[in-house]
Amino acid sequence: MTALTKADMADHLSELTSLNRREAKQMVELFFDEISQALIAGEQVKLSGFGNFELRDKRERPGRNPKTGEEIPISARRVVTFRAGQKFRQRVGNEQID
């Protein structure tokens, strides 16, 4: 299984548009920066036909060191969640697996 990288996205964008590779790379970076900044500002990011990104706060909870069995607290933190939209789930779910 291969991975799609930001560089791959920029290359594909430059092939489909009149942007050169440098401009396409900047466009991809700006896209992800915009999503990051919106999440940092506490906004929900809704991409129609794709899905929603949201920042959630997780409370502190008890955990366990798997090597020693010692109980340790897992600190509170913020996590990014993604919920795929219905159209996206249908499109991905209907693809054939080789």
Curated annotation (Swiss-Prot):
One of its GO terms (cellular component) is cytosol. PROSITE patterns: HISTONE_LIKE (PS00045). It comes from the Bacteria. Keywords: DNA recombination, DNA-binding, Transcription, Transcription regulation, Translation regulation. GO terms for molecular function: DNA binding; structural constituent of chromatin. InterPro entries: Hist_DNA-bd, Histone-like_DNA-bd_CS, IHF-like_DNA-bd_dom_sf, IHF_alpha. CDD domains: IHF_A. One of its GO terms (biological process) is regulation of DNA-templated transcription. Pfam families: Bac_DNA_binding. Heterodimer of an alpha and a beta chain. This protein is one of the two subunits of integration host factor, a specific DNA-binding protein that functions in genetic recombination as well as in transcriptional and translational control. Belongs to the bacterial histone-like protein family. PANTHER family: DNA-BINDING PROTEIN HU, INTEGRATION HOST FACTOR SUBUNIT ALPHA. This is Integration host factor subunit alpha. It comes from Acinetobacter baumannii (strain ATCC 17978 / DSM 105126 / CIP 53.77 / LMG 1025 / NCDC KC755 / 5377). The gene is ihfA.
